[in-house]
Amino acid sequence: MKNLILILLFTLTITNCDKTKETPLLLPTAAEPSAKLHNNQGIEYFNKGDYLEALIQFTQANVADVTTGEIYFNLGLMQHLRGNHEQAKILFKQAHQFANGNKKILESKLIEKHLDP
């Protein structure tokens, strides 16, 4: 139910999107298979502009694997796009925590924007 409410809020606020140059990240080769599947589907939907379905798929990827930084980055990106910067900040902190050396996460200008005081 909580996810449904988040999805509905996302839908209502998508028109207030802040454009960004960053795009969702692929998962590492060794990532949990169902997490990779949902993440890849999320990226496809993101690229088609279907941000609601992308959010759903990234959320499902996170359910399958809670230790992959790329998933948190992708969820943070979605929250950033909907203007929910406090939630994006929380997710980007988790992305950093689970980055495992991924420079796209560690050197992300978008993450820096949210994490800098």
Q: What residues fall within each predicted segment?
A:
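Conserved structural position within tetratricopeptide repeats
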Residues: 60-63, 97
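Canonical tetratricopeptide repeat
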Residues: 40, 74, 107-109
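Helix-start (N-cap) detector for alpha-helical repeat units in TPR-like alpha-solenoids
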Residues: 28, 34-36, 69-70, 103-104
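Bacterial Sec signal peptide processing site at the extreme N-terminus
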Residues: 17-30
